From Swiss-Prot:
This is Uroporphyrinogen decarboxylase. The record marks D89 as: Transition state stabilizer. Homodimer. Belongs to the uroporphyrinogen decarboxylase family. Pfam families: URO-D (PF01208). InterPro entries: UROD/MetE-like_sf (IPR038071), Uroporphyrinogen_deCO2ase_HemE (IPR006361), Uroporphyrinogen_deCOase (IPR000257). One of its GO terms (biological process) is protoporphyrinogen IX biosynthetic process. It comes from Leifsonia xyli subsp. xyli (strain CTCB07). Keywords: Cytoplasm, Decarboxylase, Lyase, Porphyrin biosynthesis.
Length: 377
């Protein structure tokens, strides 16, 4: 593989974030203080977010660099978390590639035309992600640059939807409880399914790469719907596409100078995280797709997840979001149990098993951050 060095001004290459607790944990180095951030930390649980969103549409906000940056920064300022997670939506790259999609409040992404046949896949893939105009992701990259300029030594995590989840949305035409149509296409028209997965992989990969090149210090794929698949179907029909998406950022590297004046500098790759919902049985396959760290949802205990991964993979997770509304003695006990079980992995980044519920009291999240930062293994 030919490697590509990040620009010297990139936060990793410039020495701002390469030694952060988050980046080092993703690379397998256990930290004295466990890093913590929350999926959907930027969102409806924050009053400042709700104020900013009045009268706006989700996709418009995602493509407004100043607003996307401000929303990304809000939870970092409020909670003191160890990372920002770029504020966007998994359908943004689809929108930028010309797919007609809108996010309907209370429902989620809704597509003008579902992708149900081989002809539909051919129509969609007529737009080659590799041939998109150079400025396709310009608004996204500007938002990343604005954000990292304020974050300084706090790393920003870039994110994208995993190829299977994007494909499932496209085939279903919107949200689904069982993703039956997607699984049907997978088996009824395997050739069309493979082309669809290659296309979503390249689009997700390009979206991730744009964020990393603009300043993100890590990259995470979110596979919200992978839990609907058997291990066999995931390994055969989804994991190769995730690996293909990761390949778009796997070549990006930076150099860390040696602490020893006579030592040699070390070249490191941008860390990659793979998270899925309901994927306890899929964890080894998710890791084999090329991730450095694995996100675990709340259904699988972290020590069990580490066992399934041979105790060699850094883990992220996995407090139950429902616990955020429980009394503090219940929540704190749960968080401490997560931290204790996380010791089974070589390194651990504390997070939730899914996103922050909109009704969560922000003060509770701040208190969880303080608890995690005060804990010692």
């Amino acid at each position: 593989m030919i490697v590509t060095a990040l620009d010297p001004t990139h936060p990793l290459a410039a020495g701002l974030t390469h030694a952060s607790r988050l980046v080092r944990s993703y690379q397998g180095e256990r930290q004295e203080v466990t890093p913590v951030w929350f999926m959907r930390q930027a969102g409806r649980s924050l009053p400042e977010y709700r104020d900013l969103r009045v009268g706006t549409r989700m996709l418009d906000v995602c493509l407004d660099p100043a607003m996307a940056s401000e929303i990304t920064l809000q939870p970092v300022r409020r909670h003191g978390v160890d990372a920002g997670i770029f504020f966007s939506d998994i359908v943004v790259p689809l929108k930028l590639a010309g797919v007609e999609v809108e996010i309907q409040p209370g429902k989620g992404p809704v597509f003008e035309r579902a992708v149900r046949t081989s002809a539909d896949v051919d129509r969609l893939s007529a737009v080659d992600p590799a041939a998109l105009a150079a400025d396709t992701f310009a608004a996204v990259q500007e938002a990343v640059r604005l954000t990292t300029a304020e974050l300084n030594e706090t790393p920003l995590i870039g994110f994208a939807g995993a190829p299977f989840t994007l494909a499932a949305y496209l085939v279903e035409g919107g949200p689904s409880k069982d993703h039956l149509r997607a699984r049907t296409l997978m088996h009824a028209a395997p050739g069309a399914w493979a082309r669809l997965m290659d296309w979503t992989a390249d689009l997700s990969g390009a979206f991730l790469r744009a964020q990393v090149l603009a300043g993100a210090s890590a990259a995470q794929l979110f596979d919200s719907w992978a839990g609907s698949l058997s291990l066999r179907d995931y390994a055969e029909h989804a994991a190769p596409a995730s690996a293909r998406a990761f390949s778009h950022v796997r070549d990006l590297t930076y150099t860390v100078p040696s602490a020893d004046p006579d030592g040699e500098a070390v070249v490191r790759a941008v860390p990659i995280v793979h998270f899925g919902v309901g994927t306890g049985e899929l964890l080894p396959a998710m890791h084999e797709a090329g991730a450095d760290a694995i996100g675990v949802d709340h259904r699988t205990l972290l020590d069990e997840a580490s066992r399934r991964l041979g105790h060699i993979v850094p883990l992220q997770g996995n407090a139950d979001p429902a616990m955020l509304a429980a009394p503090w003695e219940v929540l704190s006990g749960h968080a401490l149990d997560v931290l204790d079980r996380g010791r089974a992995a070589p390194a651990h980044v504390f997070n939730l098993g899914h996103g922050v519920p909109p009704e969560t009291d922000p003060a509770v999240l701040t208190r969880v951050v303080e608890l995690v930062h005060g804990w010692r293994a």
